Amino acid sequence: MRAGRGGVPGSGGLRAPPPPLLLLLLAMLPAAAPRSPALAAAPAGPSVSLYLSEDEVRRLLGLDAELYYVRNDLISHYALSFNLLVPSETNFLHFTWHAKSKVEYKLGFQVDNFVAMGMPQVNISAQGEVPRTLSVFRVELSCTGKVDSEVMILMQLNLTVNSSKNFTVLNFKRRKMCYKKLEEVKTSALDKNTSRTIYDPVHAAPTTSTRVFYISVGVCCAVIFLVAIILAVLHLHSMKRIELDDSISASSSSQGLSQPSTQTTQYLRADTPNNATPITSSSGYPTLRIEKNDLRSVTLLEAKAKVKDIAISRERITLKDVLQEGTFGRIFHGILVDEKDPNKEKQTFVKTVKDQASEVQVTMMLTESCKLRGLHHRNLLPITHVCIEEGEKPMVVLPYMNWGNLKLFLRQCKLVEANNPQAISQQDLVHMAIQIACGMSYLARREVIHRDLAARNCVIDDTLQVKITDNALSRDLFPMDYHCLGDNENRPVRWMALESLVNNEFSSASDVWAFGVTLWELMTLGQTPYVDIDPFEMAAYLKDGYRIAQPINCPDELFAVMACCWALDPEERPKFQQLVQCLTEFHAALGAYV
């Protein structure tokens, strides 16, 4: 794959730096070969280590990992580059450090807004020796409460070994949001009069009792009022099906990239240095919603009844070109005539079946077409209408996207010459991934599980806008992507998480796994994952820790995102909102080098 606008390895251009959240993930990876510069030291080395403990990282970031800045004299520039956001309610930071031989230190701070925050305080001296035993020092970051402002803090630590000329400077960047404190309410005249009456032994008890009574009543009323407002807001929020504006604006197509038509697929164990899985939040899915597949329990009459409210007359649909065709299913480019004004027309996709389709196949098409029904988001493509008239083959109508199926589009891009202006760049591919992650993040918030996320179940238009659609007819149109493992059900084995393969369990976490494979599809321009692996061996293969290898010219930071999605434990996979943030930051970093 030739590098487009992204400046990837092998392109000869500048390489974009990893975004902040990826820097943190990379900093927590197990150390491989010592590529980071070491502390200036004597030949034996002082063996200095400085890090945030697992408890401290969990308190600040919610991650179960230690964050090393220096490990046995090796400096982690990934970790030092991360500008850590300190929660506004957190006033203390704790650093763990030690050295095996004499190392002198000098500690200093810089704050960009002294009105919002005073100079940080520490419980150690400003200069001295790094302790020889494992020790913790505390940094206090207390706001003044005078203004609302984000404060940037720089902690500079100079480490000196053996002589004053032999030193290393470490800069730790932090930022914290400080808020203005509410002013205390001044005592009113009524309060003053009341304060004088409390010395009256006759009226003291009744007056205090009355005040407490009225205050209690007022507080109760206020609480009831607030609860009512909150319930009303939550109800309105759940009823509104608004499009969430959490995807970034589309980036334009630029200099193209092409990829060789063949690529030798390699597979790596998850614990090898080039395929290590970064640590992610263990609390990513506090309550996993697990579903079992029960489509075969629905009858054709029940399936038609569920879509009766969006049924339209067959006369309003005109079928044009056949876009895709399988054994029993077809997708047409269609025209939908407006019900009130026959002169108004809309272009549509029309999914339907051939005459030889069985009742089970028709039922499955209707049922799976309803997967995204009623959901509204710019990166989702739910059905809008159906035609279920007697004597006619059922039809499912969806909005039209003029570049069609994403998988077919990617494979077409692979055949395009490198100098073709319509070829897409790496930045465009990342932008597509962001859009898919945004749509899936919306589904996760609505507790909707897709079960079959893949490039084949997405569509794209000429502005490179991508939308996720259902998987109706996908088994028929992409038969090589589905396999039956002896249970009489065709499943997308190569896209499925281990718990889905073994226990037929699906959740938002299993959708995250499929997203990682979809991201791999994007970076390989539509290649098939695990193409050399027997579908019956996939579960054992994944259990042993093997994963698909890093695509050619795929940046390490982007492959780290994929690896996060393929953690065996569903709880350790990132949430879609975290993936949106990671990919958006990486997309911005690519754009900075265009």
UniProtKB/Swiss-Prot annotation:
Keyword line: ATP-binding, Cytoplasm, Glycoprotein, Kinase, Membrane, Nucleotide-binding, Nucleus, Phosphoprotein, Receptor, Signal, Transferase, Transmembrane, Transmembrane helix, Tyrosine-protein kinase, Wnt signaling pathway
Keyword Ubl conjugation: no
Positions annotated to bind ATP: L323, Q324, E325, G326, T327, F328, G329, R330, I331, K351
Expressing tissues: Is detected in all the tissues. Highest levels are seen in the ovary, lung and placenta.
Low complexity bias locations: 250-266
Subunit and partners: Interacts with DVL1 (via PDZ domain).
Name listed for the protein in its UniProt record: Tyrosine-protein kinase RYK
Native species: Mus musculus (Mouse)
Lineage of origin: Eukaryota, Metazoa, Chordata, Craniata, Vertebrata
Encoding gene, per UniProt annotation: Ryk
